[in-house]
């Protein structure tokens, strides 16, 4: 798009418009209610995690293998029978080593552990519990600052914050349970706690966060989990490194995940990295071959566990938290989806119109850094409500006869507007993600169904016609992607009036449609900036220029109806000048077409 057309969008906006280029530089303001809820979620999660992570002294019997070094949590005196059956008292100092990892429990150690078990409880360890909870909360605060800086929109979405907290709690809790279960096997094989740590499938949490939210959050999630598990394994420096590297690779491997089977490949890559990291750790520590083989086997099991957990739980989290992952969205693009099949059979014109809008919306979304897959899916499904009354929309009419000619403008307006509500109902019936339903509901905003409004004024020139009665019910677009679909819809519909247009005319048409939508205050609820609008306009022009490229007439070939169609178009343009109305999605720039339009 040339500089002249770039400036057109800026000049037409009033200076008091909220849509301005400085919006991106404004500090993020979080509503008090979500902020309080987020704080409450963080406090509850930190308290629960502190309870889960609080070290518990295992009660081991004489001869059992200690999987970790155990020290006395506090000083105590113990009475024990001596060799001659006389009672002997001995003291244990706080922090004194009771049993070393990898050693068998002695009779003395067993008595100390039994005595500690009798006094164990939150009441006796309140200080440690409070300190651990405060530490967890501090780690959460660092994560919060990162989210506020790089993903501020997430803080206003309590549903996703709750999902993040739940995944964090489940990852740590499952690891603690799995650690106890694996310890039973390790006792038989005489393995130490590090080998147990290698077998825990903790990378599944980061992979789920990346799939359900995004990679940046998965990066912070991996850091938090690694630090907390470092506490759980009593400061072993290699365990956090192992978890962090495995989690990052697991998240990286699903950034471009397009199929559910891709999780298997991600699990295989995670396994290779696990084995590589384990090999480096064992080589550094000078471990023997047999110990190294056990560690490698543990790393392999951990990667297998990651794949199984993600494959089983991903559909569950998608459904419960209504998250539209790229995998789910790509499945919705399958032409064999029931709604798309019904659309192509009942409303073929609408279907092909939606495909073109999908091309425009995807390109525009990619240009401004939004989700292009969501934009295409939203475009494919935005007009599914036309399935019920396809003949009332211009793209599905194959004759000059217009059903609206026999209807009052008010009734025609209701029929045109009803496809939004009917589309939302169909989407909910087929359990489409809420992100797609929002696009369906918002793709017209509260725009005016201008042709029927003008027609009503002509039929009743002495009656005050309420403009609100001829507007779509809304709401206006709340997200950039919904706004992109609205713009693409209007631009694509308006472009149908063009015939072999030069590039400059396409640019002028695109800017005219976008400016009209902006001036109608349809974009004031989303975060589009002037720079975004310029980029969107440029991407539209590029796509439309490819569609309306110059064509030549082949000698000896006649095109039946060509001239008749051209005359018909000329007639429509003449009538349009009389009405002076433009298309506002649901209506074309051509007033005669508007009576039959979407």
Language-model features, listed with the residues they occupy:
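Juxtamembrane "helix exit" motif at the C-terminal ends of alpha-helical transmembrane segments
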Residues: 50-57, 139-151, 172-181, 275-286
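Short hydrophobic/aromatic-rich motifs at helix boundaries and adjacent loops
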Residues: 178-179, 221-222, 285-289, 332-334, ...
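Generic detector of multi-pass transmembrane helix bundles and their immediately adjacent loops
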Residues: 166, 170-173, 177, 184-195, ...
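Short, well-ordered coil loops that connect the C-terminus of an alpha-helix to the N-terminus
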Residues: 215, 323, 370, 433-434
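Membrane-embedded alpha-helical signal segments
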Residues: 1-163, 209, 345-367, 373-430, ...
């Amino acid at each position: 798009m040339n500089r002249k057309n770039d400036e057109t969008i800026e000049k037409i906006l009033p200076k008091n418009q909220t849509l301005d280029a400085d919006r991106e530089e404004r500090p993020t303001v979080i509503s008090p209610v979500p902020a309080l809820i987020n704080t409450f979620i963080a406090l509850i999660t930190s308290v629960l995690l502190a309870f889960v992570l609080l070290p518990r002294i295992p009660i081991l019997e004489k001869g059992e293998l200690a999987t970790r070094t155990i020290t006395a949590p506090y000083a105590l005196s113990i009475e024990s029978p001596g060799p001659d059956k006389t009672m002997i008292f001995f003291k244990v100092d706080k922090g004194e080593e009771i049993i070393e990892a990898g050693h068998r429990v002695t009779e003395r150690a067993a008595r100390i552990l039994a005595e500690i078990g009798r006094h164990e409880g939150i009441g006796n360890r309140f200080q440690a519990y409070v300190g651990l909870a405060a530490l967890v909360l501090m780690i959460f605060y660092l994560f919060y600052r990162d989210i506020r800086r790089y993903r501020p929109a997430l803080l206003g979405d309590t549903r996703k914050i709750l999902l993040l907290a739940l995944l964090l709690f489940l990852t740590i809790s499952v690891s603690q349970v799995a650690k106890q279960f694996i310890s039973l096997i390790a006792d038989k094989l005489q393995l130490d706690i590090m080998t147990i740590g290698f077998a825990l499938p903790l990378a599944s949490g980061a992979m789920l966060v990346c799939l359900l939210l995004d990679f940046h959050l998965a990066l912070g999630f991996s850091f938090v989990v690694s630090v907390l598990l470092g506490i759980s394994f009593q400061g072993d420096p290699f365990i956090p490194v192992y978890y962090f590297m495995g989690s990052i690779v697991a998240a990286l491997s699903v950034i471009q995940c397009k199929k559910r089977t891709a999780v298997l490949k991600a699990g295989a890559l995670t396994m290779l990295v696990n084995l590589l990291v384990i090999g480096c750790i064992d080589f550094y520590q000078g471990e023997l071959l047999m110990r190294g083989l056990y560690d490698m086997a543990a790393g392999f099991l951990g990667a297998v566990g990651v794949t199984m957990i993600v494959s089983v739980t991903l559909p569950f989290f998608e459904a419960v938290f209504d998250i539209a992952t790229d995998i789910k969205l790509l499945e919705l693009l399958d032409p064999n989806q029931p709604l798309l099949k019904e659309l192509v059979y009942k409303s073929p014109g609408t279907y092909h119109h939606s495909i073109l809008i999908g091309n425009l919306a995807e390109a525009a979304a990619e240009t401004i850094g939004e989700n292009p897959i969501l934009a295409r899916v939203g475009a494919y499904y935005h007009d599914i409500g036309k399935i019920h009354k396809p003949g009332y929309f211009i793209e599905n009419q194959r004759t000059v006869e217009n059903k609206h000619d026999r209807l009052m403008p008010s009734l025609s307006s209701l029929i045109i507007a009803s496809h939004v509500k009917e589309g939302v109902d169909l989407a909910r019936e087929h359990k489409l993600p809420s992100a797609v339903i929002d696009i369906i509901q918002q793709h017209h905003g509260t725009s005016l169904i201008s042709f029927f409004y003008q027609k009503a004024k002509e039929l009743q020139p002495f009656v005050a016609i309420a403009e609100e009665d001829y507007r779509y019910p809304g709401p206006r677009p709340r997200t950039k992607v919904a706004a992109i679909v609205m713009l693409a819809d209007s631009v694509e519909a308006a472009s149908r009036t063009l015939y072999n247009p030069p590039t400059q005319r396409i640019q002028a048409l695109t800017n005219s449609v976008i400016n009209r939508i902006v001036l109608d205050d349809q974009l004031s609820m989303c975060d589009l900036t002037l720079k975004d609008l310029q980029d969107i306009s440029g991407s539209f022009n590029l796509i439309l220029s490819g569609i309306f490229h110059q064509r030549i007439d082949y000698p000896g070939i006649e095109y039946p109806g060509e001239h008749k169609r051209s005359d018909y178009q000329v007639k429509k343009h003449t009538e349009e000048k009389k009405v002076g109305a433009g298309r506002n999605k649901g209506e074309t720039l051509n007033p005669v077409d508007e009576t039959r339009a979407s």
